[in-house]
Each structure stands twice: as C-alpha cells, then as structure tokens.
C-alpha cells in the first residue's frame, strides 16, 4: 500500500508554491534600485544616458517659472526622451540655495532649492557643477547646492569640499559595464581664488585629466569613460586649436567620449579614432533669445558591453523651453 504523504511534506509543498506570490505582493527581494534603472530598458543590455547643455534657473528662466512653473520648462518630447533613458546629466548653470554670499563677478545667478524636485521628476538624475557659475553664491552656497541636489534625489558632479573630492571621477553605472564620468571646468574663475583645500569646483588641468583617464583605463580595459568639459569661447561656433589638441590627447589615453559646454552655441562636432567629441552642445533651459543661442543639441549614449552608439539630437529653445526637432 502506498503511504500517504506526511503533513510536513504537504506544508513544504504549499510554502514553495505560495512563496513567489507572497514575494510579489510584499516587495521582499526588491533591491530598491530606482525602477527607472531596473525595468525592461536593461533587458536589451543597453544603458542609455542623455547629456544636456546649460540649465539656468535665474534671470529670464526665473521669470518664466514665476509665470508658469518649473514643470512647464519640459516639453513633451524632452519628457519622453528623459523618461526612456536610464540617466540624464545636465549642466546646472547656477547655484541652487537660499544662501546669498557676496561675490565679485559680472553675471551672478541663483535658483531656488524648491525647484529641484521638479527636475528629478522630469527625469534628470545628475547635475554637473564644474562650471563658472556654481560659485555665484560663494563656497557656502556651493556646498549647500550639493546638499540640496542630494535632497532632491539627484547626484552632483564636479564639486566638493576640496579639489581632490571635486575632481574625483563618478561611477554612474556598473551595468552593462562600468561607466565613469570625469568633469572639469577648463576656465579661470572670475575673482575667485584657487584654494584647493576649500570647497570648490573641479578645475583639473589636461595633464591631471589624462592621469584620471589612464588610471581608470588601467584598472578596467572595458569601462566607458565620459568627459564633461566646461570650456572654450562663448558665442563662437568653432573649437579653438588648443581644445582640439586637448581633446585628442584625452582620447589617445583612453577617453571614450567628450561632451563640452559653456559656449552657449552649437560648436564643432568631430570623430577622432572612432570616438565622439562634442566641443559645445549649447544651451538647454536658458533665456538667451538670439538664433545662435537657441539652436543646440542633446547627446544620447547607448552603451552595451562592447560598444556605444552615439546619437545627436538637435533642439530649439523657445522662451526658455527646449523642444526636440521633429
């Protein structure tokens, strides 16, 4: 006669059958990674990163926000692009703080911290601070800006409590491979003393940037290295000979892509040794109205385990709002 299964065995079978169902309701086993980065967009083993130009939250943009709100700065096409990407890196062209610290420079900007959550809501994940306006409210304003960015759920890049921290490469992803961002301001700061032991933005020389790239490449031959450089001449369309030389030196030692801003214009784009160099991608959310300042682009990187597809997406800025070209 066949023996009846024991009660203990029956209980074990029931538990095995019910466990996946219970987990799906309880959330146990969820790694708490942002859903944006763990959904089907990674199913094809592709990491999508979008990089924008200058994002200003003062002057004419402040007036626009006062009239229509921060959410209105994001057109439907931009919203769709950002939310279909894993990461979005924008160059924040102002401190965002309640601190007002006297500085001596021509253009002084400041945004409101309460506006930052809207940037995160619309898909921005990282804000680059290695530029000539992050110090517009002094060192205390710079430190507070970093904290406000973190509170809003984003990650600041290119600034720190000292130069060593400000210049440290940022690992933004390990899937499908390690992706590093190295950011630097390649211009002198107006009436702002270089004090490397004090809060500051990254102002690494090309030789120092080369050392960062060489170190990253030596540690991981297959990593992806993106450089964000705030450099060049404002309101010019061509890169300088020095920029071209510097960019090629960085590619020669292992950089995979270089994206620049500061010019407020769309500048030279070239490919060197199969690697893209965007010397200046122009503005993003900005109040300059001249045609030369209203044409820009965003850059989309689609990174897999062994290659990267780079896409140039032209935009037009109308009344501070960027629109993707149709």
Regions found by a protein language model. Give the residues of each.
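Binuclear metal-dependent hydrolase catalytic cores centered on His/Asp/Glu-rich metal-binding motifs
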Residues: 62-76, 109-110, 173-225, 322-326
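Active-site-proximal segments of metal-dependent phosphoesterases and phosphodiesterases across multiple
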Residues: 99-120, 223-256
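A short C-terminal boundary segment appended to hydrolase-like catalytic domains
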Residues: 32-35, 42-46, 56-59, 63, ...
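N-terminal catalytic scaffold of extracellular/periplasmic and nuclease hydrolases
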Residues: 35-130, 136-138
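Active-site environment of divalent metal-dependent phosphoester hydrolases
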Residues: 58-60, 96-99, 132-146, 163-168, ...
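Short acidic, glycine-rich surface-loop motifs adjacent to enzyme active sites
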Residues: 85-98, 131, 213-238
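Conserved beta-sheet core of the metallophosphoesterase superfamily
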Residues: 123-126, 239-297
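Bacterial Sec-dependent signal peptides at the C-terminal "C-region" and cleavage site
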Residues: 18-44
């Amino acid at each position: 006669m066949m023996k009846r299964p024991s009660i203990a065995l029956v209980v074990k079978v029931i538990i095995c059958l019910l466990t996946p169902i219970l987990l799906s309701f309880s959330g146990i086993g969820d790694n708490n990674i942002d859903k944006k980065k763990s959904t089907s967009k990674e199913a094809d083993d592709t990491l999508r990163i979008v990089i924008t130009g200058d994002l200003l939250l003062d002057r004419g943009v402040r007036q626009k926000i006062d009239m229509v709100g921060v959410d209105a700065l994001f057109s439907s096409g931009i919203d769709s692009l950002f939310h279909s990407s894993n990461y979005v890196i924008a160059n924040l062209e102002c401190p965002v703080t309640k601190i007002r610290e006297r500085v001596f420079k021509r253009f002084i900007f400041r945004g409101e911290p309460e506006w930052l959550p809207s940037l995160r809501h619309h898909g921005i994940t990282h804000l680059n601070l290695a530029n000539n306006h992050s110090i517009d409210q002094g060192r205390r304003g710079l430190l507070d800006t970093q904290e406000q960015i973190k509170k809003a759920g984003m990650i600041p890049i290119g600034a720190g409590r000292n130069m060593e921290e400000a210049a440290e490469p940022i690992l933004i992803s390990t899937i499908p491979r390690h992706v590093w961002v190295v950011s630097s301001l390649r211009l002198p700061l107006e009436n702002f003393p270089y004090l490397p032991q004090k809060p500051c933005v990254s102002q690494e020389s090309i030789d120092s940037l080369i050392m960062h790239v060489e170190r990253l490449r030596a540690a991981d031959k297959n990593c992806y290295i993106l450089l964000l450089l705030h450099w060049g001449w404002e309101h010019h369309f061509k890169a300088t000979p020095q920029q071209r030389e510097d960019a090629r030196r960085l590619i020669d030692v292992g950089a995979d892509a270089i994206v620049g801003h500061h010019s407020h214009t769309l500048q030279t784009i070239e490919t060197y040794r199969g690697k893209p160099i965007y010397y200046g991608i122009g503005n993003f959310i900005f109040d300059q109205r001249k045609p030369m300042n209203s044409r820009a682009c965003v850059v989309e990187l689609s990174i897999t385990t062994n290659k990267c597809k780079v896409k140039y997406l032209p935009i037009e800025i109308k009344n501070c709002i960027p629109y993707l070209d149709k």
